[in-house]
Amino acid sequence: MSIPANVLMEISFQELTSKKSEEYERKRLNEIGDLLTPQKIEEVLNCKDTKQRNVSLEDIFQDFLNFIITKNQEMFSMDCNSICKSYVLKVAEEKIEKLLKENGTLKNEEKCLRMQIVAQEEYVAPLIQKLEIIEKKLDKSFRKNMEDELRITRLASENNVLISRIDRTKRHFSELFTQKQMLQLQNENFKDDYEKIKEENKRLYKERKSFLSKIEKSACEIHDLKESDSFKDHEILRLKEERTAAMQAIDDISGTIETIKSDCYKVESENKGLINEVMDMRNFVQQLEQELYAFEDDYSRIQNDEELLKVGMIHLNKSENRTVEEMKIGDFGNTEEAKDVCVSDEDIHNVNIKQITTLIGKMSQVQIECKRLRKENLFLQSERTHLLRELEELRHLATSAKEDFVKVEKLNKIIKDENENLKEYIRNNSLSFQATAGELTQCKQLPQPRITGNDQENSHYTGAGNNCLELVGKENNCKNQYPQYFSNIDESNAFINNQCLELEALNRKNDLIRGELDSLKEKNLVAQKQLKSANNTLHVRAKHIQILENTNQSLKKNLENGRAEFRLKEIALIDLANQQIKNQDKTIHDLNTELCSLTLDYCNTAVERDTLRFRALEYLDHNKQTNPLPYHIVYMFSFETSPTVFQTSPEEDKENVNNIKISQPRNSLQTNGYIEGMANNVLDASFNVEDESHAISDSELGYFCEDQSNIYEVEDMRYYLFYTEEEKNMLPGFIVNARPANLDLFPCCYETTDKRSKHLKNMLNKKKLIKHIFHL
């Protein structure tokens, strides 16, 4: 069986298209394989840095774009117009009108496609703007993340510093707590010692009372013995001896009492000092607790930048940057200079505390800013996620566009193959048509057949006619088949034009993408410059922070040196004060020894004077219950031994009590504890009668001060109170000008009722002066 020509043409056309498509795919795969090698893929996958990975991906995409552009240029370089012209020349003139009509339709379709392209460009323009905005935001977020990481590292180091400070303060607090416990134990021991001393004082007071009762009994016995004349001389001698022994015993007891009092006053002063130290320690502990709470609050709150705090540390007082050599202790001979130095150190310490409070305020501001930055960071992270989603969508669209472009390229290749096959088929048909035309001309040139009876000629003519009929059939078949082929060619040409327009649009998009890539490269360069500048600024700030830390350490050292200096100055001042107290104690001891010797001599002379005077004996006859000798004894022990001076006018009589004026106390007998307590007891004697430590109790007042007083008693008291001019010349001034400590014992020394308030005022002024002198 013979296969028709149409089937053969279709089979050959399919074989050619399959071969060409396979060759094209092989070439394309080989070229793409040259572009995407496994080495490049491994390099991209092994890149840990996102920047390098992005750069390598951009290079790969650029290579793909260049490949696509070259292929498009090759497609356009093909002489499609010449092919179309060759087809049009071969086609009959009747088809020209159809082609013109189809050209009009194609122009309309071209306009529609251009409108679609413009619409797509308008749709793509805002997406490109969004991409630029997204890239800017990503750059900002990346910078902020880098800054946040640096701040976090900074704050971690600063938090470690704060933790070390808190540990130091806790250790210091524990040491202070142990010191506080030790001081409390010492205070309790001092209290126990003070109570023991009080009990001993009471016991000695009872012994003194018993001793005074014995003296009274002995005085009564003396009175009984004096009534007998035979034993007077003997008893007088015995009484003198007993009196001297009693006076010595009383002096010893009074000395022990005074030592006990001095010990009590020393204990009281030590207790006061300990109480002050305990109060200072409590205040210091409270300050440390406040500092601990402040440090703990700072440790819990500080999670961000403290640059403001460090800037504030620069403005600290530069006067504190003193070296240790400048802070050495000099000569502390002048106590006022030492006090001024201590006051200046305290002022510096107060200034440091104020600066610390200002820094705490700045830290609170920094915490507020940290919270604000956290909120901004969260907002930026949310925006970043949104932008990343949009980028993924755009990448998906780009991949879909690439796939469409690949499909279009495949279709273009298929159409090219079809065009080539059609060209070959048309060439073959044209050759066969020319052959048939030549045969027809030959047939026409043949002579017409003769109608004869010759069979050979008839057969010849019939064979030629059959051949002519076959040729005419072939021609008709070709004419019937040509319009189908031409219609297919027109459709393929229209499709090619559409594909060309799409390729032009894709080229434009590629140009836009190139421009965007160039802009991205420029932005990357700018970002790199900014990163370099940021790194430089960070390096400078790190150096600045190191300088601030060094200054902070130097300030801490200066504070420690200042505290050490303050302690050394305190120790030096305490040593000076102790030396002065020792010197004053020595002077007081010397004066007390002199006073005791003088009082003993005077007592002996007074005893002799009492025995020789007849006036005393008359007084004993009138009032047997009283005795001038105990009065005199009590007078000597109840007199004030403080350094008071009584001034009188030379013209008036010194024995007149109203003419005596109190002068200020002397500064030569200033002591720390002994004279202070003695002066307080002496001044409070006229107001506190119920005090057990007083020289004379209420029971003794009943003995010495009776309601039945007479003129003789007052005169006798004046006699014993005031000395004669000879005695005044013999005795020293502080004994001559002495006055009784308790005026209730000596009514003759009372002032008038009008002047009683003045006397009390003078006593109060005296108290104030003593307190001012002893710095109470």
UniProtKB/Swiss-Prot annotation:
Coiled-coil residues: 87-122, 173-227, 265-307, 362-430, 496-595
Coiled coil among keywords: yes
Protein name: Meiotic expression up-regulated protein 1/2
GO BP terms: meiotic cell cycle
Presence of the UniProt keyword Coiled coil in the record: yes
Keywords from the UniProt entry: Coiled coil, Meiosis
